[in-house]
Design a protein with these regions (language model features):
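The conserved Walker
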Residues: 43-47
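Conserved pre-motif I regulatory segment
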Residues: 1-42, 153
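Conserved nucleic-acid-binding Ia/Ib motif block in the N-terminal RecA-like helicase ATPase lobe
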Residues: 3, 7-12, 16-19, 68-138, ...
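Walker A/P-loop NTP-binding motif
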Residues: 27-39, 50-68, 86, 91-95, ...
């Protein structure tokens, strides 16, 4: 199977990267995400998991006829480390290069002013570490009323690092009617409960 179910602009960006065949996690996750289903994916690093959630989300945003006139964030991706946030942000920028989608990476290594300006002016996609995002949300930054997709990446690592309370606090700020995607190398009931 190829990436034919994705919007043509996203297909073009994928072709530019040289990928021609979906990995097993992509084969299973992409169709479900495109249909709007919540997904819990068990996948190790290096299996194409980032593309498994970013590609269908970008495709859905690109196909959406709703203009993001309110400049509310439509996608929130939470990851445990600034390195992973930066990597996901780069992947999103690569796959979204033929779209007009706006993204920001939120973590401690980026200046406050740049992050706050982008959050307050509105971006389509936020990729963030939980602690840094919670700090900014508690200071009144970020608009989540139009949020459509929540992704928790490497949820097992976030549990190990003690981020679960921060994630629960952030999730209380989000609309209940959203698509929730959780990816983890392992699964347990505490991790699974994060999507609810």
């Amino acid at each position: 199977m190829s990436f034919k179910s994705l919007h043509e602009r996203i297909q073009k960006a994928v072709a530019d990267t040289g990928y021609s065949k979906e990995t097993p996690i992509q084969e299973r996750a992409i169709p479900r995400i495109l249909k709007g289903a919540d997904v819990i994916g068990i996948a190790q690093t290096g299996t194409g998991k980032t593309a498994a959630f970013t590609l269908p989300i970008l495709s859905k945003l690109t196909e959406s006829t709703e203009a993001n006139e309110t400049r509310c964030t439509r996608v929130l991706i939470i990851a445990p480390t600034r390195e992973l946030v930066s990597q996901i942000h780069e992947n999103v920028r690569t796959y979204a290069k033929y779209t007009n989608l706006h993204t920001v990476a939120i973590h401690s290594a980026v200046s406050d002013n740049g992050q706050i300006d982008k959050l307050d002016s509105g971006v389509d996609i936020i990729i963030a570490t939980p602690g840094r995002l919670l700090e900014l949300v508690e200071r009144g930054h970020g608009r989540f009323s139009g949020l459509k997709h929540l992704v928790l990446d490497e949820a097992d690592r976030m549990l190990d690092m003690g981020f679960i309370p921060a994630i629960r606090t952030i999730c209380k700020q989000l609309p209940k009617s959203r698509q929730s995607l959780l990816f983890s190398a392992t699964m347990n009931p505490q991790i699974e409960s994060l999507t609810k």
